[in-house]
Structure formats: structure tokens, C-alpha cells
Amino acid sequence: MYAIIKHSGKQYKVSEGDLLNLDHFAAEKKSIVEITDVLAINDGSLKVGAPFVEGAKVVLEVVNEGKDKKVVIFKKRRRKDSKQKRGFRRQYTRVKVTSIVA
């Protein structure tokens, strides 16, 4: 059984027991979060919502919060001795899918 959920403008394909790194949101460690924005669900037969599947939800448990590896943005203009180096680390909330309710 799997579901396709929408969270903070992105879509994720999830199954029970999966670990996901979602964009950072305010939640306590070990807290339970329910997502009702389920775009599609497959439990033997595919149900596609318009835009969301009615009555479906995905229950998540917050595992921890953290930062991804650093991404380096480097810009250089040739022959001008002009360069710019900048780093970025995305903050995420790691969650575990505990159940999918159709």
C-alpha cells in the first residue's frame, strides 16, 4: 500500500515504515502529525483525488530535525577576477510514516 501526499508544495510517495526528510516545520520530537492532503492512494486499487482523496490521511511521527549537507554555490566571471562563493544548508524535519488510512 502506498500514497502520494502533498506537503509544503512538494509531492512525496510514501509507504508504511518509510523515513522522509520534509521541509522544516514546527513540531516536537516524538509528536504525531496527520496529513490530509492525499493526492492518490493505492491499496490494491488506485484511488485518485480531485484534488484530494476524501477521508484519506497519512499519520507521521516526528523523529528529529536537522540540516542537510552543505550545497556550494560558486559564480565566476572569466577574465574579470570576479567570483562569489556561497553555501546553503536546507533545514528538514525527519518523519516516519506510521500508518496510511484510506
Swiss-Prot record:
Keywords: Ribonucleoprotein, Ribosomal protein, RNA-binding, rRNA-binding. This protein binds to 23S rRNA in the presence of protein L20. The keyword Nucleotide-binding does not apply. It comes from Campylobacter hominis (strain ATCC BAA-381 / DSM 21671 / CCUG 45161 / LMG 19568 / NCTC 13146 / CH001A). Pfam families: Ribosomal_L21p. One of its GO terms (molecular function) is rRNA binding. Part of the 50S ribosomal subunit. Contacts protein L20. InterPro entries: bL21-like, bL21-like_sf, Ribosomal_bL21, Ribosomal_bL21_CS. This is Large ribosomal subunit protein bL21. GO terms for cellular component: cytoplasm; ribonucleoprotein complex; ribosome. Belongs to the bacterial ribosomal protein bL21 family. GO terms for biological process: translation. HAMAP family: Ribosomal_bL21. PROSITE patterns: RIBOSOMAL_L21.
